[in-house]
């Protein structure tokens, strides 16, 4: 029997989640890694606020740079206390999650912490991000 550990590796890695006010509704999609190209989102959504799932958007670990195949994907992010949220990837997270402040507040309770470490994450169906599951 053959098992693949690749899906488990992503969620087992220790990453952090932080927030950045740059991920505002009026931010041009031309400013993020998922702007244009084959996997770009700008043609459909000129501003970040138009992306279904906003404000639960931001940089994710699986987007390394421009035109990543992970652009627009949905991720369930769980912090150590068990709280979780769905985040739609629109930018590079540079090894972690960096999200809209409102999404961070939904997850953590406030922006006071600034960052939470030891975050688990797993890719989920896009419907979790666009159907108001948060």
From Swiss-Prot:
Optimum temperature is 38 degrees Celsius for the non-enzymatic cellulose weakening activity. Generated Asn-98 mutant protein displays improved cellulose weakening activity, thus making it a potential candidate in the production of biofuel as an enhancer of enzymatic hydrolysis of cellulosic materials. It comes from the Eukaryota. GO terms for molecular function: chitin binding; toxin activity. Residues 1-14 form the signal peptide. Optimum pH is 5.0 for the non-enzymatic cellulose weakening activity. Its main location: secreted. Keywords: Cell wall, Disulfide bond, Secreted, Signal, Toxin. Residues 31-43, 65-68, 91-95 are annotated as: Binding of N-acetylglucosamine tetramer (GlcNAc-4). One of its GO terms (biological process) is modulation of process of another organism. Residues 18-20, 113-116 are annotated as: Binding of oligomers of N-acetylglucosamine (GlcNAc). Phytotoxin which causes production of phytoalexin in platanus acerifolia, platanus occidentalis and platanus orientalis. Induces cell necrosis in tobacco leaves, and in callus cells and leaves of P.acerifolia. Induces reactive oxygen species (ROS) synthesis, nitric oxide (NO) production and mitogen-activated protein kinases (MAPKs) phosphorylation in the leaves of A.thaliana and P.acerifolia. Monomer. Belongs to the cerato-platanin family. This is Cerato-platanin. The lineage of its organism: Eukaryota, Fungi, Dikarya, Ascomycota, Pezizomycotina.
């Amino acid at each position: 029997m053959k098992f693949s550990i690749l899906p488990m590796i992503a969620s087992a890695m220790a990453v952090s989640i932080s927030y950045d006010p740059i991920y505002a509704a009026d931010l041009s999609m031309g400013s993020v890694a998922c702007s244009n190209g084959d996997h770009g989102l700008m043609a459909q959504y000129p501003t970040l606020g138009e992306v279904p799932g906003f404000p639960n958007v931001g940089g994710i670990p699986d987007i390394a740079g421009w035109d990543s195949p992970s652009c627009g994907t949905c991720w369930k992010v769980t912090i150590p206390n068990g709280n979780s949220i769905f985040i739609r990837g629109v930018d590079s997270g540079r090894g972690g999650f960096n999200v809209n402040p409102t999404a961070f507040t939904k997850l953590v309770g406030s922006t006071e912490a600034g960052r939470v470490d030891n975050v688990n994450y797993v890719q989920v169906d896009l419907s979790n991000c666009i159907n108001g599951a948060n």
